[in-house]
Amino acid sequence: MIPLLSLFYIVAVKVFKKTAPNGKITVYLGKRDFGDHGSYCEPVEGVLLVDNEYLKGRKVFGQVTTTFRYGREEDEVMGLHFSRQLYLALEQVLPTKKNEAPSDFQNRLVRKLGTLAHPFTFALPENAPPSVTLQPGSEDQGRPLGVEYELKLFIAETEDEKPHKRNSVSMAIRKLQYAKPSPLAKQPSALVSKGFMMSSGKLQLEVTLDKELYFHGDKVSANVTISNYSKKTVKNIKVAVVQNTEVTMVNGHFHKTISSIESKEGCPITPGATLSKVYTLLPLASQNKDKRGIALDGMLKEGDTNLASSTLNSTGDAIGIVISYVIRVRLYMGAIGGELVADVSFKLANPEPVPVVPGSQESKAQQEKARMKKQLSREMSTDLIVEDFARRRQFSEDNE
């Protein structure tokens, strides 16, 4: 009994579902997050279930749009809009004009839903900006600032016809930035110094990170070395992870402290003394839920999200929000001595799925898993865990 249950969970697939208000058109998606791998973007794949009698010769069109909101909705007056919408894809889904082979997920879903189900695929352009949401404050109203993606399928005579809400389905999706470490990447570092008037010698600060690319949830370690060749005294040290946000449309720049520590260990650093210490910080979105303006990796209503990933493919005419991160080390020397600051840039991103090498243990395990899936699908129906956008529920073919 136990092995049978384990096989049952192996073949279970989570599916997102949403139905039009009139119940005549339903859209199924296998996932809502689509990755940008740098050289290519994952396509938006799903299945459409439509009542043919309701169509009456009309067609089903689909579109993927991105909305860049750079101002608050409550400030939009007299026809002034602080948003810009771009159509990334607009195609006829039914009857389809493409001759593409459906994916395994689409085939399984079509077999389950029957002859009224039709697969569809939309390709996202490589230069499309990633999803970013600026976290709203407790008093903010309206839609949050940032870059949002939406998939919409609707019934109409032509693609130029304005969709009606009663026979259209809109689903929020996200475009995430994936990255993988480069073997040629160098350790980021910075070396700064400060001289003082009416005083000989300089204060020197060197900051080095253990690597350039970090994934969400990783700890960031900074090796700080302070050499005091001046006559001043370092009284306090502060290390922080700072998120830099650039809103390209309005040329706005924002700086938010994500994580910080303040230490007096090893202080005061008197003239002629040195200090070398490693400081570790953990930048997480969960620790900044109350901070207004923190950039996140898009925000879906169903769950939490990460901090916004670093913008890896930024160009001079980029439309969207450019994100970067720095480790900032600040030395305090009192009111007269002032401060010494060093910034070291690093990248924060989602890990790119690791491809399976043929012949490896992972490859053999996946092949065995696929073999068991095929065998089980022949012996019993495959279960689908369907998550409705309006409410969550589960159903199985065995109970239908």
Curated annotation (Swiss-Prot):
Alphabetical list of InterPro entries matching this protein: Arrestin, Arrestin-like_C, Arrestin-like_N, Arrestin_C-like, Arrestin_CS, Arrestin_N, Ig_E-set
Molecular-function annotations in GO: G protein-coupled receptor binding
SUPFAM superfamilies, per database record: E set domains (SSF81296)
Entries under Gene3D superfamilies matching the protein: 2.60.40.640, 2.60.40.840
Example GO biological process: G protein-coupled receptor internalization
Keywords assigned by UniProt, alphabetized: Phosphoprotein, Sensory transduction, Vision
PTMs per UniProt: Phosphorylated.
Gene Ontology cellular-component terms listed: cytoplasm
Record keyword Phosphoprotein present: yes
Function summary: Plays an important role in the photoreceptor transduction.
Similarity field: Belongs to the arrestin family.
Protein name in the entry: Arrestin, lateral eye
Source organism (scientific name): Limulus polyphemus
